[in-house]
């Protein structure tokens, strides 16, 4: 049962591919909203039930259509009923008043889109590898408490979209989560000197 936080907003991310959900953590903390998971082409029953029971008005989707399809977005926007066998359950979701999508061509670009939307003036940025989830999972909670975005990077190279984000931001403090096996010294130096 949901008793605290923002009762009208949820973040929706792929439960099949973790990076967008990790990038969305800071936004969820800022919004005081949960992250619900979905499949690319269908909404799991537990997510449908949450949307219907909570009567969500705003849904923020992490990732473009290759992560979460237009069909899922349409169901979120227009609503749905939940069937139990041959009967319609009392849980009917009338659709969101607002559906917002935050995504880019890949996980790195998506992290910058979410960062710019969530904390556009943050002077702190948290970096974590986009290649596995443990460090980024820790980074999301830390970033949310510091009102900072999480940017995902490669182990051995700094994506150009991250360089561009760094150049156009007012970053005064960086936090890199993970050791050299997650983010190489080379990338760490690029982040420091960007």
Language-model-detected regions and their locations in the chain:
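Extracellular glycan-binding segments that recognize GlcNAc-based cell-wall polysaccharides
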Residues: 1-194
């Amino acid at each position: 049962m949901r008793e605290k936080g923002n009762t009208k907003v949820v973040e929706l991310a792929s439960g099949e591919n973790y990076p967008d959900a990790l990038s969305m953590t800071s936004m969820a903390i800022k919004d005081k909203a949960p992250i619900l998971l979905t499949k690319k082409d269908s909404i799991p029953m537990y997510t449908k039930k949450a949307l219907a029971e909570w009567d969500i008005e705003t849904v923020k989707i992490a990732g473009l259509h290759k992560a979460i399809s237009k069909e899922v977005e349409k169901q979120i926007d227009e609503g749905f009923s939940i069937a139990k066998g041959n009967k319609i359950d009392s849980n009917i979701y009338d659709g969101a008043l607002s559906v917002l999508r935050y995504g880019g061509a890949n996980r790195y670009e998506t992290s910058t889109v979410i960062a710019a939307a969530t904390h556009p003036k943050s002077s702190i940025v948290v970096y974590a590898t986009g290649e596995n989830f443990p460090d980024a999972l820790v980074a999301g909670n830390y970033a949310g408490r510091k009102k900072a975005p999480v940017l995902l990077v490669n182990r051995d190279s700094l994506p150009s979209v991250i360089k561009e984000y760094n150049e156009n931001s007012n970053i005064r403090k960086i936090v890199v989560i993970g050791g050299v096996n997650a983010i190489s010294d080379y990338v760490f130096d690029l982040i420091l000197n960007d």
